[in-house]
Design a protein with these regions (language model features):
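Conserved short alpha-helical segments that host acidic/polar catalytic motifs at enzyme active sites
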Residues: 1-251, 260-296, 335, 430, ...
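Active-site phosphate/pyrophosphate-binding segments
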Residues: 261-265, 269-299, 379, 389-518, ...
Length: 611
C-alpha cells in the first residue's frame, strides 16, 4: 500500500519527491518522509511526518533539503503504528545509508535479533529498518555488492530503493511481488512504485520485474538479475494523458470517475464486438473451441469490489457458456486446499494488478496446474505479468479509493468473456447473441442517461444520510449489485450497511428491520420479480423506508416503496451495469452529506499490497 519515489539528476530532488508522492496518495498512507543527500555537507538529511503530505511540506517549508539525489515514501502501517520513528526512509547506525521499502520482510525478527547482537541500535518497530543495518554490515566500498548480499538475506515481498552517502550519484532498486518502475529522463532518472508519480516528468519507462536489480544514475540505468547477469529491457512508452490523474473540474476524484464510466465502458468495448454484433472478438486470447471445451471448471478469484464483479462474472459464464464457476475471495483461496487440475481455468480480477492476496492466489493456482487468466486495468502490473493471458479493462487511471469505473469495466470484460466462451461452445443461439451484443453497444449511452438525473439521489442522501444502518436487498444479479452498493456506502460514508439475498430475509435478517430503517431494494430480474416484490412487502410491513431500483416501464414497484430510482431498460443480464450507478451516487452523496473524506476514506487504501 506504500508509495515509493526516487530521484537522481542535476535538479533539486526534494521538489520531485514531494510531487511524486502526491501523485501516489491514492495508494493510501498514514505518514510520509523523504531523504536527500547533500553533497556540500556530505550527509543524508531525513525528514518525516505523520499524517498527510501537507504536514511534511509544512515541516520542511522554511528549510527544504538541498541535494540532487533522494528517495521518498508514503507509509501504510503494517509493523508498528503510525509515528515519525516508524515512517520511512530508514537509516543505519551511521546515517550513511537510507532505504524506502514497500511490502513485508518476513524474516525480519530473526535478522533484527542478529543485528542487535552485533551491536546495531534500532529506532523503530518496523521490518524495514533491518535493511539499512544489513547494508551497513555488508558495505566494504562496493555499494552494489553490499545490496546483493542484503537481498540474499531477506525473505518476503517487497520493492526497495537503497541510497548510500558514499555513492552520491547512485540509487539501487529491486522488487519481488510489489510494483516498481523507472522513469527515463534527460540527465535525470526517476524511480516510483507506480507510473502516475513520474508521468509529469517522463513517458519513457522501464517496468522492473521480480528479481531484477537496477543501478540508477542520472545518465544511465544498469539492470541485472539476482546473479548479476545483465538484462536488456524494452522501453515502455506511457500513453496516458497527464491530465487523466486530475479531478477535471469535479469536486472529488470519485465523482469524476463515476461520470467517466460511459467513456471507460466504451473504451473497454472498443474493437471487441464484431461489426454485425454476431460475436465477441478477444484477440488477446485466441482461444479455440477445443481449448474452451476442455475446461471442466472455472475459478474466479478476487478481493473487495473485484470479488463482486467476479460474482456477476460467474452468472455470465454459467448462463451463457454453461461452464460451472466457483468464485473465491483471494485471501481464502490459497489456504483451503482448492481442487484444481490442468483442465481448470482460473481467472483473477484486480484493478491495480498488484493486489497481493490475488497475486498469491494466482501463483498458487499456477502451481497446482491451472490455466490462468487475469482481468486488470494496469498494463505491465505484477498480476498481468504472472498470468498466462490477460484481458485488460481500459478504465484509465482510477484515483479514488472506492472503485467505480473499474467495477463497471470489469463487468464488461466478464460479459465479453462469457459471450466469447459461449460462441466457441455453441451454447447461445445466433439470434440471442446478436440481441445481447447489440444491447451491449447501447450501454455507454444508457450509462450517460442514468447519470444525468442525480437530484433525487442527492435528496435521498440528505434525508437518510444520518441513519446508523442501511440494508440492501435483491435476488439473482440484483443481489450481486446490492453487495457492491452496500460496500460503497460503508467504505466512504462509514454507515453500517449490509446486503442480503432477498429470499434470506426470513432466515434472520428480518429481525433487524425496524421503523425508519432505509432499505434499498433492487427489482429488475424478471424471473424472480414477483418474489422480490413479496420480500419488499415484508420489510415495508415493518415500517422500513424502501428505496426501489427498477427499469423504466416498471409500473408495480412504486406501490410498495417510498421512492423509486429508474434506470433505462435493457436485457436483465446487462442491467447490473446500470443499477450499480445510482448506488455509487447514493454512496457518494451520503458521504458528502456526512462530511467524510470521499476520495481517501479512513483505514483504507487503493492498492492492497500486503496480506
Amino acid at each position: 500500500m506504500c508509495g515509493i519515489v526516487g530521484y537522481v539528476g542535476d535538479k533539486q530532488a526534494a521538489r520531485f519527491l514531494i510531487e511524486g508522492l502526491t501523485k501516489l496518495e491514492y495508494r493510501g498512507y498514514d505518514s510520509a518522509g523523504i531523504a536527500v543527500y547533500n553533497g556540500e555537507s556530505d550527509a543524508i538529511r531525513v525528514e518525516k511526518s505523520v499524517g498527510r503530505l501537507a504536514e511534511l511540506e509544512k515541516k520542511i517549508d522554511s528549510n527544504v533539503p538541498v541535494g540532487c539525489m533522494g528517495i521518498g515514501h508514503t507509509r501504510w502501517a503494517t509493523h508498528g503504528g503510525p509515528s515519525d520513528l516508524n515512517s520511512h526512509p530508514h537509516t543505519d547506525c551511521t546515517g550513511d545509508f537510507a532505504v524506502v521499502h514497500n511490502g513485508i520482510i518476513e524474516n525480519y525478527l530473526a535478522l533484527k535479533e542478529e543485528l542487535i547482537e552485533a551491536g546495531h541500535v534500532f529506532k523503530s518497530e518496523t521490518d524495514t529498518e533491518v535493511l539499512p543495518h544489513l547494508l551497513e554490515t555488508y558495505y566494504e566500498g562496493d555499494f552494489e555488492a553490499a545490496v546483493r548480499k542484503v537481498l540474499r538475506r531477506i525473505e518476503g515481498s517487497y520493492s526497495i530503493v537503497f541510497m548510500s552517502k558514499a555513492d552520491p550519484d547512485t540509487l539501487i532498486c529491486t522488487k519481488q511481488d510489489n510494483p516498481l518502475v523507472i522513469g527515463l529522463g534527460e540527465g535525470e532518472n526517476f524511480i516510483a512504485s507506480d507510473i502516475p508519480a513520474i508521468i509529469a516528468r517522463t513517458r519513457r519507462t522501464y517496468i522492473i520485474n521480480d528479481g531484477e536489480v537496477a543501478v540508477v544514475k542520472k545518465d544511465s540505468v544498469w539492470i541485472t538479475n539476482r546473479r548479476g547477469e545483465p538484462i536488456t529491457k524494452k522501453v515502455f512508452e506511457v500513453n496516458w494523458n497527464a491530465e487523466a490523474a486530475e479531478k477535471g473540474g469535479y469536486e472529488h476524484f470519485m465523482l469524476k470517475e463515476i461520470h467517466e464510466q460511459p467513456k471507460a465502458v466504451r473504451d473497454t468495448l472498443s474493437g471487441r464486438i464484431a461489426k454485425d454484433d454476431s460475436a465477441v472478438i478477444l484477440d488477446e486470447l485466441k482461444w479455440t473451441a477445443e481449448y474452451v471445451n476442455s475446461f471442466s471448471k472455472v475459478f474466479i478469484i478476487a478481493c473487495g469490489t473485484a470479488y463482486h464483479a467476479g460474482l456477476v462474472g460467474k452468472y455470465y459464464i454459467e448462463n451463457l457458456a454453461r461452464v460451472p464457476v466457483e468464485v473465491d475471495i483471494a485471501s481464502e483461496f490459497r489456504y483451503r486446499k482448492p481442487i484444481i487440475a490442468d483442465n481448470t481455468l482460473t481467472i483473477v480480477v484486480s484493478q491495480s494488478g498488484e493486489t497481493i492476496d490475488t497475486l498469491a492466489a494466482l501463483k498458487e493456482a499456477k502451481r497446482l496446474g491451472s490455466k490462468t487468466m487475469a482481468v486488470t486495468n494496469v498494463v505491465g502490473s505484477s498480476i498481468a505479468r504472472e498470468a498466462d493471458q490477460v484481458v485488460y479493462t481500459w478504465a484509465g487511471p482510477e484515483i479514488a479509493v472506492a472503485s467505480t469505473k473499474a467495477y463497471t469495466t470489469q463487468l464488461i470484460v466478464m460479459f465479453l468473456l462469457g459471450a466469447y466462451m459461449a460462441g466457441l461452445r455453441g451454447t447461445v443461439e445466433d439470434s440471442r447473441m446478436k440481441e445481447l451484443l447489440g444491447k451491449l453497444r447501447n450501454i455507454p449511452a444508457q450509462i450517460s442517461e442514468t447519470l444525468e438525473d442525480v437530484d433525487p439521489i442527492k435528496a435521498f442522501a440528505q434525508q437518510y444520510g444520518y441513519n446508523d444502518d442501511v440494508f440492501f436487498l435483491g435476488r439473482a444479479l440484483d443481489y450481486h449489485v446490492a453487495l457492491e452498493g452496500s460496500l460503497k456506502l460503508k467504505e466512504i460514508s462509514y454507515i453500517h450497511a449490509e446486503a442480503y439475498a432477498a429470499g434470506e430475509l426470513k432466515h434472520g435478517t428480518l429481525a433487524l428491520i425496524t421503523r425508519g430503517i432505509p432499505v434499498v431494494a433492487l427489482a429488475t430480474q424478471k424471473s424472480v420479480y414477483e418474489k422480490t416484490l413479496s420480500n419488499i412487502k415484508e420489510v415495508k410491513a415493518r415500517d422500513a423506508v424502501v428505496i426501489g431500483v427498477a427499469a423504466k416501464g416498471d409500473t408495480e414497484l412504486h406501490k410498495y416503496t417510498d421512492h423509486v430510482i429508474f434506470v433505462p431498460e435493457t436485457d436483465e443480464l446487462l442491467i447490473p451495469l446500470l443499477t450499480v450507478l445510482p448506488l455509487q451516487l447514493l454512496a457518494y452523496y451520503t458521504a458528502l452529506t456526512r462530511g467524510c473524506d470521499v476520495d481517501k476514506p479512513r483505514n483504507l487504501a487503493k492498492s492492497v499490497t500486503v496480506e
